[in-house]
Amino acid sequence: MKIKQKHVIIGLLMAILMAAFTLRTANIKNIPAGIYPDEAQNGVDAQLANSTGEYKLFYESNYGREGLFINLQALSIKTFGPTEFALKIWSIIFGTLTVLGVFLLASELFQNKIAGLIGAYLIAFSYWAINFSRIGFRAIMVPFILSFSFYFLFKGLRTKKLHDFVIAGLIYGLGVHTYIAFRVSPLVLVALFISLLITRKNFIANYWKHTLVFVVALFITAAPMLFDFFIFNPHHYASRTSAISILNPEVNQGKLVSSIAKTFALSLQKYVVMGDLNMRHNYPPYALLNPLTGVAFLIGLFYIIYKIINLLWLRFRKDIRNEKLDIYIFLFAWLIALLIPEFLASEGNPHALRSIGTLPAVIIISIIPFMWVLKKYNSFGHGFRIFVISSAIATFAFIAIADPVKYFIYFANSPKQHEVFDANLRVVSDYIKAINPSQEKFIVTGSMQRLPIKYLNPNISNTFYFYPGEVQNISPSNTDSAIFIFTGADWDAINYLRTKFPNMTFQDHRNSFGDTFYTLKN
């Protein structure tokens, strides 16, 4: 590659990374409008870990969560305090680095840096990627782990350098510490291994050391969690999954095949037809991909399916080996395998969070039509070249505008977004901060709803939490200064306390987005 061309590519990559970082950090305090209780549970666990010094491999609350992300959040909370930024900075970092990972992996797979730039561009401006890079969920680590580990793996297959396999294994082994969906990813390695046996003569003889090094390296980083899952705490491994698994006869009601067919169809169509209907995961009812990327993905998917069939036929009927088969099988296996956590679950499909491991694969598959046009460009006539250039400019402009506008204008200003992120709980948190610390504050709320308030206000004194069914146990020491705060319309609890303290004034607090809470005070 020429020096000038290299500098241009580096410059474009840096511009894409800067755009990605900006989209993942802009107004992070207020978009999303609240801290969802699942995020806050991470924060509360991280605060407890900081106070006790017990940083765990696995946190059992909230159905159980792998500890790596929470422990990183503990570090940022210790540094920045109990803020939205501290809770989400690691999502921002991993989300931005995944853009770099896709660039590296796509460049390696296509042996073309332009392919890498296109992939980086598509994921940088993707609503799906932006959204989960701005929420404090551990799942955002999965695309990061997979893109970088697979990059070094394919680089090692090309260079035969052992250190690439070591790095690939060490990164891949960390994946078991991230999110439950990662656990199906070994199926991708199995499919790739079979493909390598098919396409390369004497693969085992030539690569047995490299394979061994990769496996040993991944076990080094995975070992602590594997020991926890399979020796010390087997119940950790099974947490969260069995109750919603479509393999459970109580769930599929004896219709396993038809149930899987239905959930698989829902999982696959979400990229281009109807996306996740949960506004925390997507902007419903729109597909996960913008229309142009969605079309590119469909074309790319049909292309790799055709090439897999074609190259397998050539291999077994005419003994023609083509190493590109490895790439096609790898991408297809990645897509299908990382869909398994979604389509084997019975609830909430389509589900953009459970399938987040497919994100890099979907983006890389979407690169294929762009590369076909680029390859054919020189064979086009002058007039058609102008048309192609104009279309490319319009396409990339649309991609850069469509999803950011959807996120920062439509999503950000949607009252529904405030509702699904429990934004009223952050309003309550801000309200509490303005109250004299000496005043008793009785917060009537549910177990999960109290978590954002606790996370944002860990040190405010005279704050007491009660369930709506426990209000009869509330006994303020000074009724003149006590304040009762209700995060929801629990009218039985509200009316009970209004009757018990008739001199207090009831107030409905409601902003323009509909974020609501209630108070009872003198």
Give the predicted meaning of each segment:
Residues 134-139:
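Short acidic/glycine- and proline-prone juxtamembrane loop motifs at membrane-interface regions
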Residues 42-50, 79, 156, 174, ...:
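Transmembrane-lumen/periplasm boundary regions of multi-pass, lipid-linked membrane glycan transferases
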Residues 132-133, 184, 324-377:
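Hydrophobic/aromatic-rich transmembrane helices and adjacent perimembrane loops
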Residues 147-165, 175:
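Membrane-interface transmembrane helices that cradle and orient dolichyl/undecaprenyl
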Residues 3-8, 108, 113-114, 159-161, ...:
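Membrane-interface helix-loop-helix junctions at transmembrane boundaries of multi-pass membrane enzymes
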Residues 470-522:
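Aromatic/acidic, Gly/Pro-rich catalytic loop(s) in extracytoplasmic/lumenal soluble domains
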